[in-house]
Amino acid sequence: MKKYNFNPGPSILPQETVNNTARAITNFSNSGLSLMEISHRSKDFQLMINETIVLFKELLSIPEGYSVLFLGGGASLQFCMVPYNLLETKAAYLNSGAWASKAIKEARLFGEIIEVASSREANFSYIPKNYIVPSDSDYFHITTNNTIFGTEIHHDIESSVPLVADMSSDIFSRPINISKYGLIYGGAQKNLGPAGVTFVIVKDSLLGNVSRPIPSMLDYRIHIKNESMFNTPPVVPIYASLQTLKWLKTLGGVEEVYKKNKEKATFLYEEIDRNRLFKGIAATEDRSLMNVCFIMNDEYKNLESAFQQFASSKGMVGIKGHRSVGGFRASIYNALPKESIKALVSVMREFEKIHCKGI
């Protein structure tokens, strides 16, 4: 039976990424060695990581004055690495979900944190708006997409202080103006590659302005100086990420994949709004293009488990909602084909016919 992968992360990868990485694990670049065996100091690896950085910058139109890093530790390590490097006195944070909350908790170890707004009272079902960022903040931190609650900031925010963004789950999904940001970070395991590598885009002029000593492993300047090789980098995830970037370029780049993402999300949201069994949980204007969260309508709550089992029997994988929300979550990242969305919609319609009279 065909499987349709809606996992929230690690998640679906382009088939080209899977195939090329599998071949490289057997024999990397005709070296006679596995990708897992090569030295990160070898010429082949140097060429590969340099190509990855060049293509990463090209696809996002990253201007001069910014560095790109590939590190370990996941986005969770960035929750403390960002304030370690940037927070001197105080910083502003927008609390739009679970990951933003965790970032705030870590940042409070380093200085005063101003939570400018939060949607916690509504279980993070919308993106807070109409807040004021103190002009003396060292930076303003946002989480652009919330995988658990299915909300997303769909535009580049204007900020009078350096803007820091966790873009773990929507990087490369839509065009962004890098020059509006001081630092962008994220785990790769949504739209870039497998788990194990973290990307950081940082404006060089922001660094070196805090008075505290920074451990070498947590100092962006050290990693920039050593070209992401201060310690052994995550070789296999970086290679797989390069394959995804190549795939993205063949599609036509970020602008083209953004069009496809809007089409996929619209198709699924329209079915959720039409279908008598289901309803969305996120504010309509803040609905994520990456993570579509929905629950059963109140009168059909007793069918939640039945739909989960029914969908699984039809090949749907990973649609169970997070425990904080319940219901269902379809993660529809760049690599997910529209065919998978159509399959899920077909399952929803079939289930509706079974359980709703007059359909």
Curated annotation (Swiss-Prot):
It comes from the Bacteria. Catalyzes the reversible conversion of 3-phosphohydroxypyruvate to phosphoserine and of 3-hydroxy-2-oxo-4-phosphonooxybutanoate to phosphohydroxythreonine. SUPFAM superfamilies: PLP-dependent transferases. Belongs to the class-V pyridoxal-phosphate-dependent aminotransferase family. SerC subfamily. Its EC number is 2.6.1.52. L-glutamate binds at R41. Pathway: Amino-acid biosynthesis; L-serine biosynthesis; L-serine from 3-phospho-D-glycerate: step 2/3; Cofactor biosynthesis; pyridoxine 5'-phosphate biosynthesis; pyridoxine 5'-phosphate from D-erythrose 4-phosphate: step 3/5. The modification N6-(pyridoxal phosphate)lysine is found at K190. It comes from Azobacteroides pseudotrichonymphae genomovar. CFP2. GO terms for cellular component: cytoplasm. The gene is serC. The lineage of its organism: Bacteria, Pseudomonadati, Bacteroidota, Bacteroidia, Bacteroidales. It catalyses: O-phospho-L-serine + 2-oxoglutarate = 3-phosphooxypyruvate + L-glutamate; 4-(phosphooxy)-L-threonine + 2-oxoglutarate = (R)-3-hydroxy-2-oxo-4-phosphooxybutanoate + L-glutamate. It is found in: Cytoplasm. NCBIfam families: PRK05355.1, serC_1. Pyridoxal 5'-phosphate binds at A75, S76, W99, T147, D166, Q189, N231, T232. Its main location: cytoplasm. GO terms for molecular function: O-phospho-L-serine:2-oxoglutarate aminotransferase activity; pyridoxal phosphate binding. Keywords: Amino-acid biosynthesis, Aminotransferase, Cytoplasm, Pyridoxal phosphate, Pyridoxine biosynthesis, Serine biosynthesis, Transferase. Binds 1 pyridoxal phosphate per subunit. Its cofactor is pyridoxal 5'-phosphate. This is Phosphoserine aminotransferase. It is an enzyme of class 2 (transferase). Homodimer. GO terms for biological process: L-serine biosynthetic process; pyridoxine biosynthetic process. It holds the Pfam family Aminotran_5.
